[in-house]
């Protein structure tokens, strides 16, 4: 059975209905695919940091991470959010196992940008053997993007980048679950959805401000993963879970990201 990686961002997480998890469970039970969930937790991390009067800043959508910030991020994502997703799946009869990238050295990472962003890492290796064991045993892996590096140093990894690395390791499709139906642009006063964007078009829309903030690492990590063998990356609306089924059936939904222009996307 083919694997599909679902990245669920922190901004959309609390908006997802039980129907979203039911769709993923149906995909698993019908043999359509083996889902892997990689999640974020930005808004809840922000809230926790604010309560503790810890300042946080972002550079190109990446959170600058000190030891203090890392501890909070790990507590929120690997603890609260991860187990909430697992509970949501198990409450509808599914079987899920919540892990962070630290567990079993699931995600091995190195520090990004020579440490200029603090303890922010990028994944260099994925323990696919462990994930395959979980999936082959009927489970859905749920991964928090806290990774482990040399000397057991922990790193905060952007969730989109972590999901891209997992999809790359399995050479699978990557579905970026959002609360919008794709990349939207206002053209002549009308909002349109770009159903297909190439790398060149993405960079142009970043420069023009159409793609901004947290969407920047989302689309860039999706494009980067394509170079390494990810079958396809797409941004879909998780608030309308039928889009997931429609996409896997080959229908035109969301925004498909490709390296270059292709026909009949």
UniProtKB/Swiss-Prot annotation:
Enzyme Commission no: 2.7.2.8
Cellular localization per UniProt: Cytoplasm
InterPro entries with a match to the protein in the record: AceGlu_kinase-like_sf (IPR036393), AcgluKinase_fam (IPR004662), ArgB (IPR037528), Asp/Glu/Uridylate_kinase (IPR001048)
GO biological process, one term: L-arginine biosynthetic process
Enzyme's top EC category: transferase
Keywords on record: Amino-acid biosynthesis, Arginine biosynthesis, ATP-binding, Cytoplasm, Kinase, Nucleotide-binding, Transferase
Kinase in keyword set: yes
MF terms (GO), sorted A to Z: acetylglutamate kinase activity; ATP binding
Residues that bind substrate: 41-42, 63, 156
Keyword Kinase included in the entry's annotation: yes
Any one annotated GO CC term: cytoplasm
Domain of life: Bacteria
Name of one Pfam family that matches: AA_kinase
Catalytic reaction(s) noted: N-acetyl-L-glutamate + ATP = N-acetyl-L-glutamyl 5-phosphate + ADP
Metabolic or biological pathway: Amino-acid biosynthesis; L-arginine biosynthesis; N(2)-acetyl-L-ornithine from L-glutamate: step 2/4
Database matches in Gene3D superfamilies: Acetylglutamate kinase-like (3.40.1160.10)
NCBIfam families per record: argB (TIGR00761)
Family classification: Belongs to the acetylglutamate kinase family. ArgB subfamily.
Function per UniProt: Catalyzes the ATP-dependent phosphorylation of N-acetyl-L-glutamate.
Protein name per the record: Acetylglutamate kinase
UniProt organism field: Oceanobacillus iheyensis (strain DSM 14371 / CIP 107618 / JCM 11309 / KCTC 3954 / HTE831)
Organism ancestry: Bacteria, Bacillati, Bacillota, Bacilli, Bacillales
């Amino acid at each position: 059975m083919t694997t599909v990686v679902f990245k669920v961002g922190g901004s959309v997480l609390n908006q997802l209905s039980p129907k979203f998890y039911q769709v993923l469970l149906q995909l698993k039970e019908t043999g359509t695919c083996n889902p892997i969930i990689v999640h974020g937790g930005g808004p809840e991390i922000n809230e926790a940091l604010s309560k503790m009067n810890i300042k946080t800043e972002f550079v190109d959508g990446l959170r600058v991470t000190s030891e203090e910030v890392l501890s909070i991020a790990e507590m929120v994502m690997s603890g609260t959010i991860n187990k909430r997703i697992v509970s949501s799946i198990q409450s509808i009869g599914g079987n899920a196992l919540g892990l962070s990238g630290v567990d079993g050295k699931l995600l091995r990472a190195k520090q990004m940008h020579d440490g200029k962003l603090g303890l922010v890492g990028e994944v260099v290796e994925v323990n696919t053997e462990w994930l395959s064991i979980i999936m082959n045993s009927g489970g859905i892996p749920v991964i928090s993007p806290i990774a482990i590096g040399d000397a057991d140093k922990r790193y905060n990894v952007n969730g989109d980048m972590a999901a891209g690395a997992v999809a790359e390791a399995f050479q699978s499709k990557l579905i970026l679950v959002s609360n919008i139906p794709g990349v939207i642009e206002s053209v002549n006063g009308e909002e349109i959805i770009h159903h297909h964007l190439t790398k060149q078009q993405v960079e142009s829309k970043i420069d023009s401000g159409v793609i901004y903030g947290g969407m920047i690492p989302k689309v860039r990590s999706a494009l980067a993963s394509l170079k390494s063998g990810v079958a396809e990356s797409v941004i879909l609306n998780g608030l309308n879970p039928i889009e997931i089924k429609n996409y896997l059936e080959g229908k035109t939904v969301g925004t498909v990201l490709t390296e270059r222009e292709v026909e009949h996307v």
